């Protein structure tokens, strides 16, 4: 077989040599130990939590080592591509604050290792496929879908491995005359890699997450170039990761089965393969069966990245929670360093679990409460305003009508060793703040069991006469004690517990009456501070309305 002639028949338009192509992509000048990672999503219109999970690993490995994290759009499967898919990818990662150093952008790309869209790299791939044909390591295959299906059925009947190999690789050694005849007829074809592997052989490999392993050598003549001249993922990622200088490939463990193919292709090209980190799949406890299962696009809305923006999960909280899944020692570090930014944590693949990572949305809410509790009132206000401007315009108008008023309320209990943890989501803010706005105030005047309606009215009347918005919390409580004593309630809880029959109730019951009148509920932040923010007129108005309703 004249392989040079075959290569010219298949690629008459390719005049560039592999050496010339490689010269376009200089070796990266980076510090020793710097890692180059990439995110390579497909523009299918659906960005999921697994994408973010892997991207966080990519970003940390690169930026902790003073390396490069870039975005490459893997759009070789045109059937699955949706309009606007690339924009969705870029917007998703931008919203989660994962900074790419180079790669595809909204209006083009940045960096010297492009194009960063695989659909624009056809000449590059075909240059290297042509070189494989010239070396007798690749060949055209004219099999129809019907012929491939028939072979599959025969393999199933014979209980053989599926695929294109051995006697089923019918175009592997066909003579030039047969190839020329099909080309003359214009028969569509793909280009396959000529594998010299055997399933009898094992390859030793060390994965950054899974550790040392043995995998079966690839014996399949896989397709490397489709009939439209665009490569398959197998070949495209090998060429791109070599030319772009990728040193670590992070991907889901579902890709482990393709590892022998990729290692074989790197060897065939004479290139050093990057290190691979195959991450565990995200699992959850099925509420119906109680067993573990993979997160499902159909069953689990939390798989979609859009879910977190719509529900109002803080971006830092989502990232911190994912880090707890990625590194087993992160929670311990966070407890010891509550005020440090997450990026101060030294992430390592050595602490990643090789088995399924269990996603628990309630645990995410807990992490989110902790993250929000460490924020300033100004930060919380800004985030809630940003979220509500898109998702709850009515609340946004009230929140932003008087920023100082809203921030003053959000500042209650913030700071100190034990900050309040009322908010897990930005969408929780409306329910947390609603009683501060007359437009949302829907009071529940349910009083403590030990307080009669007559006593409640008297307590409210007394408090209205002595209310001072400038009181300290201690000053307010002293007044509660006075009112309690005047109406037969213990001014001291210990005294009440010592002789229950001597009192109607305790001072806590009295202060709860005022809390219910002002806040319209029994659970609210520090009442004296709340009343100071509402102002005297509003407090007296609410005391009066409550008394009238009893």
Locate the predicted segments by residue.
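N-terminal Rossmann-like or analogous alpha/beta NTP/dinucleotide-binding catalytic cores
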Residues: 2-157, 257-271, 317
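A generic secondary-structure signal for well-formed alpha-helical elements
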Residues: 18, 93-100, 133-140, 152-155, ...
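Glycine-rich phosphate/pyrophosphate-binding loops
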Residues: 63-77, 235-251, 272-283, 525-543
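Active-site cores that bind ATP or allylic diphosphates and position pyrophosphate for catalysis
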Residues: 139-278, 283-295, 304, 464-481, ...
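Catalytic adenosine-cofactor/nucleotide-binding cores of aminoacyl-tRNA synthetases and other
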Residues: 270-450, 519-550
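Glycine- and acidic
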Residues: 37-44, 70-75, 243-249, 302-305, ...
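Helix-rich, typically C-terminal accessory recognition domains appended to large enzymatic cores
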Residues: 480-487, 491-534, 538
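Residue-level signal for inorganic ion chemistry
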Residues: 58, 89, 132, 136, ...
């Amino acid at each position: 077989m004249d392989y040079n002639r075959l290569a010219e028949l298949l690629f008459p338009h390719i005049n560039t040599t592999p050496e010339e192509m490689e010269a376009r992509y200089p070796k990266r000048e980076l510090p020793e130990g710097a890692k180059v990672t990439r995110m390579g999503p497909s523009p299918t219109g659906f960005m999921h939590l697994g994408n973010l999970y892997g991207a966080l690993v990519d970003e940390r490995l690169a930026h902790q080592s003073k390396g490069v994290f870039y975005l490459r759009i893997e759009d070789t499967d045109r059937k699955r591509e949706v309009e606007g898919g690339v924009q969705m990818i870029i917007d998703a990662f931008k919203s989660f604050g994962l900074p790419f150093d180079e790669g595809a952008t909204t209006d083009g790309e940045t960096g010297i290792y492009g194009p960063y869209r695989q659909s624009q790299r056809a000449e590059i791939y075909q240059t290297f496929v042509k070189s494989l044909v010239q070396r007798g390591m690749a060949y055209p295959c004219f099999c129809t879908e019907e012929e491939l299906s028939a072979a599959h059925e025969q393999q199933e009947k014979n209980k053989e491995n599926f695929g294109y190999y051995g006697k089923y690789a019918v175009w592997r050694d066909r003579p030039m005359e047969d190839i020329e005849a099909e080309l003359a007829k214009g028969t569509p074809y793909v280009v396959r890699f000529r594998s010299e592997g055997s399933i009898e052989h094992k390859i030793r490999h060390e994965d950054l997450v899974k550790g040392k392993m043995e995998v079966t050598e690839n014996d399949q003549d896989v397709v490397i170039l489709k009939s439209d001249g665009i490569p398959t993922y197998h070949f495209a990622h090998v060429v791109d990761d070599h030319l772009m200088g990728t040193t670590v490939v992070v991907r889901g463990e579902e890709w482990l089965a393709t590892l022998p193919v990729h290692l074989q292709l790197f060897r065939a090209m004479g290139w050093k393969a990057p290190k691979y980190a195959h991450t565990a799949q995200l699992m959850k406890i099925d509420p119906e069966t109680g067993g573990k299962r993979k997160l499902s696009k159909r069953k689990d809305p939390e798989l979609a990245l859009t879910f977190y923006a719509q529900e109002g999960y803080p971006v830092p909280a989502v990232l911190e929670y994912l880090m707890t899944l990625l590194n087993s020692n992160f929670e311990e570090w966070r407890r010891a360093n509550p005020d440090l930014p997450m990026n101060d944590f030294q992430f390592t693949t050595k602490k990643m679990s090789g088995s399924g990572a269990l996603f628990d949305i309630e645990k995410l809410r807990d992490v989110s409460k902790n993250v929000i509790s460490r924020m300033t009132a100004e930060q919380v206000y800004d985030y809630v305003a940003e979220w509500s401007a898109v998702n709850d315009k009515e609340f946004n108008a009230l929140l932003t009508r008087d920023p100082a008023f809203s921030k003053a309320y959000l500042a209650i209990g913030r700071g100190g060793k034990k900050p309040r943890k009322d908010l897990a989501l930005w969408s929780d803010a409306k329910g947390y703040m609603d009683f501060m706005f007359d437009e949302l105030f829907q009071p529940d005047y349910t009083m403590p069991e030990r307080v009669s309606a007559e006593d409640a009215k008297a307590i409210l009347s007394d408090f209205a006469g002595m209310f001072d918005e400038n009181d300290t919390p201690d000053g307010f409580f002293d007044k509660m004690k006075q009112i309690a004593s005047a109406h037969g309630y213990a001014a001291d809880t210990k005294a009440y517990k010592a002789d229950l029959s001597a009192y109607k109730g305790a001072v806590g019951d009295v202060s709860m009456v005022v809390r219910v009148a002002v806040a319209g509920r029994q659970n609210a932040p520090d009442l004296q501070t709340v009343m100071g923010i509402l102002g005297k007129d509003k407090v007296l108005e609410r005391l009066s309305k409550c008394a009238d309703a009893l």
